[in-house]
Every structure is written in C-alpha cells, then in structure tokens.
Amino acid sequence: MAKTYDTYKDCGIAWIGNIPSEWKTCRIKDTSLLYTGNSIKDEEKDFFQDMNEARPYIATKDIDATYMSANYNNGLYIKHTDCNFRIAPPSSTLMCIEGGSAGRKKAFIDREVSFVNKLCCFAPFEGVYGKYIYYFLCSPNFEDIFNSKITGLIGGVNIPTLKNIECLLPSISEQKAIATYLDKKCGEIDSLISLQEEMISELQAYKQSVITEAVTKGLDSNVPMKDSGVEWIGMIPEGWNVSSLKHIINGHLQYGANESGTLFEEGLPRYVRITDILDNKLREDIQKQSLTEEQASGFILQDKDILFARSGGTVGKSFIYRRKYGRCAFAGYLIKAAINQKNDADFIYYYTLSSSYDEWKKRIFIQATIQNIGADKYSLMEIPLPPLSEQQAIASYLDEKTSQIDSLIAIKQEKITELKDYKKSIIYEYVTGKKKV
C-alpha cells in the first residue's frame, strides 16, 4: 500500500487541493528562470551543421511528445563562441509554449543546448531540483491550467503568465526522492508503451504486406503470372494490365483551391487541407475551415475522389473522399484524381497504400532536388489493373482484412492511452504529495 504523509493542509490552490503540511506553495517564477530561445531561418541552417566545439540546437520537432525526450542529434549545432543564441543549462526543462504543441511537448535536458523561440527554458534556481520541476510541469493538472491560459490566433501562453502559475516546493531532499522514484516508475511505463508501439508497427507492416500482395498478385495464388514490366510492381496475374493513372481518370488531375479558409460554418463546404487528413479520415480534433460557395466552385469533391499530397513532409499521402463527410472542397497543396467508371476507386486507393506505391515515390524523390510530386508525375504513375469485377472483389477482401487488423491496432492504441493516463496519475500523486515515496 502506498505511503502518505502524516498531516496535510489546504494549500489554497483549487487545482492542487490538500498538500503535506511541510510543503510550501510558490509560483513558477520562484523556482526557475524562464526564457525563450532563438530561431534559425531555413536558408541559414547550412551554417549550423558543424558539431565540433558546438552545442546541440533543439527545435520543437526534436521533442517526443510521448516519451518527453529531446533528440540531440538533429544535425543543427551552435558554436560555443556564438553569443547570438541563448543557452539552456543541464538539468533544465524545455517546454513548447506556442502553436499546436504548446504545453504538450516538454523535455528534461541533460546537457547544454540552444533552442528555438517557441520553446521556453525552465532553468532551476539553487535549492530547486530540476527533475522535480520537470515532473511538476508534466502533471495533468498543470497541463490543464496551462491550456486554460492559452490565447491568441496561434495559441500560446506568454512568459509573464507562466511565471505566475502556482507551484509546490517540498524540501530539496524530498524533491530528489520524488524525481528518482518517478524516473523509475515512468521508465517502466515507457517500456510498456514502447512494447505496444512495436506491436503496432508490426501490425501496420503486416497490413501493408496484405494490401501489396492483393493489389499486385490478386487473390488466387494459382493463376499464371507474367512480368509487369515495372520493377517495383514485379510479377502480376496473366489477365492483368498495367496502366498510367492518367488513363483511368475522368478528365485531368486537378490542383485544389488556392484560397485562405475561414472558420468552419455549417452550410458552407468544409475546406480540406492535408492537415485535416489522418489515417484516411477527416479529423474533427482540429480547427476546421470553410470556403465560401464562390471560392469552392470547381473544387467540390465527389464520392470516392482520391486526393494526393504534392509537397511538404506529407508528400505522396493519399485520401479517398466519402460522401459521409458532407460537402468538401480541397486545398491547393492537394491533387484530385476522379477515377473513371471502368475502374474501382477503392482498389486504386488501396494501391496507394502498398509498398509498390512507396517504392514508386522513392524513385521520384531520387530524381528530384526537393520532395515534390506534381500532377505531371502522378499522371504517369503505373498501376496494376485487373478486370473491374476483380478490382471490386479485391477491394471488398481488403475492406474486411484491413478492418480486422485496424481493430487489433485500436486495442494496442487504447492500451497506450491507458498507460499514458496511468503515468500522468502517478506523476500527479507524487508531485502534489498525495502519496509519499
């Protein structure tokens, strides 16, 4: 049974409640020096790649939101002699305070680093144990308070506001004991999370192998095969053909609307951007946007239209639109393919989830100086094509098989959510003194 402290008192802070009688309340500004870092322009990054006599430079993307760890080997380094960049000392915490990752991404720093301007450094004062402050910032109640103070279009919390958030401060020996215990417990939980993630990766790889086998070899393993003539597709059933995407669509591939969306409004078309798409679903957990009828004219999606991302980190990502999503228009960084009636759109979409499609993308990237796939390249993409009835049978088979695999993945993801919640509850109980080490 977990130990508790001998006596408690009301700390006067509603979101913390009762605390051990010996503990003190204070504000974040009483525990740490807070300051943000410095940005590096994209065109300047080539000047910051020499790691000799330099410290790592940490950007928001270098912090893992699950494991709360920093990647020190991202390829960017600041020379020790460069006085233009602020420094986070060892035993400090970096936390994102602006944008979509605000309050979510944080990491304890075990070495001297420089860091981006969206990150705030919490450098502990003398008599404050840095790892304890890190865990306090990781507690769910602190995260709730942080989120309640987010303001502005970009969404963030400024440093003066952060400084005045309440904090708890036990004795330095108690801080160290709590941090050491949480290191052990959170490490154990992180190992369990990692195991679940490995199993998810294996299931995802299996799912892709099932898809690839079906869309390139068919469902009958006994049919005669022939060479497709395309290296990354390989052998295909004798009765199949290979065709370019441009020959199986209505009209031409179409770029989306080059418009700025407005806040989503019922009755107007939803504006689908690449950030709206996750796991072939339209996300509901982001701020949706709309276009006016005039802006959306000519860009309204029809049932089973396929969208392709043409640039950026998600280049090559695909999505099949379903009527159930309501009226939608698509954005300019997406390309639409309207599959003709001689072919099955679901089969074509499944091909874009195959390892053959991934290999095609890699070949395109090798030929290009930047990762960009325009309509000209997509239009020439080779696709193995069985007769329509067989396309439909394969799509139905994959609907069932991938649904089964997705159900197994969902179970693993639910387990990860439970483990994360358990981790947060343990952190809360010990950094607020509800339990004693």
Please place each PLM-identified region on the residue numbering.
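A short glycine-rich beta-alpha junction/loop motif
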Residues: 8-11, 113-120, 151-176, 327-335, ...
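Non-catalytic DNA-recognition/assembly elements of restriction-modification systems
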Residues: 7-41, 164, 172, 176, ...
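Sequence-specific dsDNA recognition surfaces
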Residues: 11-12, 29-47, 60-90, 110, ...
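Amphipathic alpha-helical coiled-coil/heptad-repeat segments
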Residues: 1-16, 22, 169-223, 384-437
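Short coil/turn segments at secondary-structure boundaries
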Residues: 41-49, 148-150, 224-228, 258-266, ...
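Periplasmic-binding protein-like
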Residues: 142-146, 357-361
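Hydrophobic aliphatic residues
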Residues: 32-35, 137, 182, 249, ...
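A short beta-sheet element
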Residues: 59-60, 73-138, 158-159, 273-274, ...
